[in-house]
Regions:
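Beta-lactamase-like hydrolase cores
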Residues: 1-45, 64-66, 103-109, 424
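Short Pro/Gly-enriched beta-strand edge/turn motifs at strand-loop
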Residues: 8-11, 175-178, 367-374
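Short beta-strand scaffold segments in enzyme catalytic cores
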Residues: 26-28, 70-74, 387
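Small-residue-rich helix-loop
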Residues: 37-39, 258, 283-425
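N-terminal post-signal-peptidase region of extra-cytosolic proteins
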Residues: 40-42, 94-96, 217, 319-320
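Active/ligand-binding-proximal structured segments within catalytic/core domains
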Residues: 46-60
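Conserved serine DD-peptidase/penicillin-binding transpeptidase domain
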Residues: 62-313
Length: 425
């Protein structure tokens, strides 16, 4: 079998002209024997892109409870102190129920939120500063609100009674949530567009010709300030930032954890659409639970030492999402994570969280078999990676990791090469 795999690996990946300048790493592992059936540069480090989310999902399944911890609610004599836990689902449009918001509404005492458990930055190390306006790079913080995004909408309709031949259309532009921040209008164009200033919550709206259009734009979080401003408008009352005196007074007082969404529901969304925000905040939630502070560098070291001590090649793990080009993992590292995941979690749960061919970010992958692959892709400029579980023609599930770095082809071409190789197994 190894010789046959080697032959097809050379045909579709290693010696293919489209990948002539690329670095390719391949690992195929049989979990039933715990042996590799094929390796090619499997011990080399590669930029994994969103394959990092496999590691984050593993850590979340191992360390987060069944329902996500949203905040610690500590009731004092004259106030309520809230300790945020990094939950990305609070008031996120993905979810209909928000237990913490209901608590806020019913509270009769003044509400205060502590901000002394945040020990990292809004933008991750190695993230592209040019992408500040893109919805896939929302800022991280201790208490996300609305996914730290403003959803903008444009609706156009035909006027019933136009005043001039040119004035035939009504255009309505609005946001969710509504904001009181600065807004200006730019030059109209074919496509609706919203551009935020890089260092300010100032949004420039350009009307498009579409009948309906939408765009999500990250807002600057300013720690807790921006989110609490939006929350005040939605809640109808303020949640203030706690001072040191109140924090000290609360010491020794017990609080209760307010839970939010089902963990696996969030992880499925994270894996299906490769949601960077959910991934990075999941890592910060783990950090808050285990270290009592949100610090991705510290929790990464803790996880490598504790849960991922069997990794054969020490990775350079930087964030939860894979947005950072500083991340480096080997294919053999990914195999260990996949193997541990399958050993520790129910197979049905893995199949629910991981997309299969034709679903999510694997929707372009196709195969006649009902089950062929459950995996996570990852791509950046010059990078395509795919790791997960593949069903061979002989009906055996194998762990696999394929990492392609520094290619000069388009992603679609590389993806098809990887797909052809996997279908040959």
């Amino acid at each position: 079998m190894q010789h046959a795999i080697q032959k097809t690996a050379k045909k579709h990946l290693i010696n293919d002209p489209a990948l002539a300048h690329a670095h390719v790493g391949i690992a195929i592992h049989d979990p039933s024997t715990n042996k590799y059936t094929y390796q090619h540069q499997a011990d080399k480090l590669f930029i994994p892109a969103s394959n990092v989310k496999i590691v984050t999902a593993y850590a979340a399944l191992k360390n987060l409870p069944e329902f996500l911890p949203s905040a610690v609610w500590t009731e004092l004599d004259t106030a309520i102190l809230i300790t945020p836990m990094g939950d990305p689902s609070f008031l996120h449009p993905d979810f209909k129920k928000h237990p913490l918001f209901d608590r806020f509404k019913s509270a009769s005492k003044p509400l205060y939120m502590r901000n002394d458990n945040w020990n990292t930055s809004a933008i991750g190390n190695g993230w592209s500063t040019d992408d500040y306006n893109e919805d896939y790079q929302a800022e991280r913080n201790a208490f996300p609100v609305y996914g730290n995004l403003i959803q903008w909408f444009q609706e156009r309709s035909i006027k019933e009674n136009p005043t001039t031949p040119q004035d035939t259309t009504d255009t309505f532009i609005y946001s969710n949530p509504e904001i009181n921040w600065s807004v200006d209008f730019g030059k109209s164009s074919n496509n609706f567009q919203v551009k935020r200033k890089e260092h300010d919550n100032f949004f420039v709206l350009s009307e498009g010709k579409e009948k309906s259009a939408t765009q999500a734009v990250p807002f600057i979080t300013n720690g807790l300030l921006s989110g609490l401003t939006l929350l005040k408008d939605s809640l109808g009352k303020a949640v203030q930032i706690a001072d040191e005196e109140l924090i000290q007074y609360s010491k020794g007082q017990s609080g209760i954890i307010i839970n939010s969404q089902h963990r696996d529901s969030l992880l499925q969304k994270m894996m299906y659409r490769s949601d960077n925000f959910y991934a990075d905040q999941s890592l910060l939630m783990i950090s808050q639970l285990l270290l009592s502070r949100m610090d991705e560098a510290a929790i990464i070291q803790e996880l490598i030492k504790k849960d991922l001590s069997q990794l054969p090649v020490k990775p350079r793990w930087t964030d939860g999402s894979g947005l950072s080009r500083y991340n480096q993992f080997s294919p053999s590292d990914m195999i260990v994570v996949l193997n541990q995941l399958k050993a520790e979690q129910e197979w049905q749960k893995i199949k629910t969280i991981f997309p299969k061919a034709g679903q999510g970010t694997l929707r372009a992958l196709s195969d006649k078999r009902e089950e062929f692959i459950y995996a996570k892709s990852g791509s950046m400029s010059g990078i395509y990676c795919l790791s997960g579980y593949v069903l061979t023609k002989k009906g055996k599930w194998m762990n696999f990791s394929i990492m392609v770095n520094n290619h000069d082809s388009n992603t679609s071409t590389v993806r098809k090469k990887v797909e052809a190789f996997l279908q040959s197994l």
